[in-house]
Amino acid sequence: MNKQVLLKNLRTIPDFPIKGILFFDVTTLFKDAECLKIMVDELYEYYKDKGITKVVGIESRGFVLGGALAEKLGAGLIMARKPGKLPAEVVEETYEKEYGKDTIQIHKDALNENDVVLLHDDLLATGGTMAAAERLVEKFGVKKTYVNFIMEITDLNGRNVFPKETDVYSLLSVSEKQ
């Protein structure tokens, strides 16, 4: 099974960034051509009939597969960035983090009410960043929004921050208790 290939190639680093945390390093999946192809193909199969017009990649690892997936779906790519990184007028959403606030932005002309949007990032942990990205995209009055991750850490219950009607899909589900 393809997901087993991904799990086999996923690097875990104990006690990073602090003691007691098991860090899942997706960069090992990006560097392997077979894994990269599996991820793009699996995501394409899931979303190919959903009418996606724009893929929004979340800074920065969401850009990696976001671009490849957008091309395969025949959709445009929008980059959701931290403040000060986009040159034109932006729309933003500020959200709470464990130790303060953060903000995510996209260009004001990036989306419209006719778009069907796929939000993509590498990892679902607590869900705060992606929930903010979803609220940001909703400000444009888009037709539909889908949320996707390469990997979900199930112990952290991040999917619970999304409204029940949000379609949340993760290629891989992992546990910090492995």
Regions found by a protein language model. Name each.
Residues T53-K54, V116-L118:
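Structural motif
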Residues D122, G127:
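Conserved G/P- and acidic residue-centered "switch" motifs that form tight phosphate/ATP-binding loops
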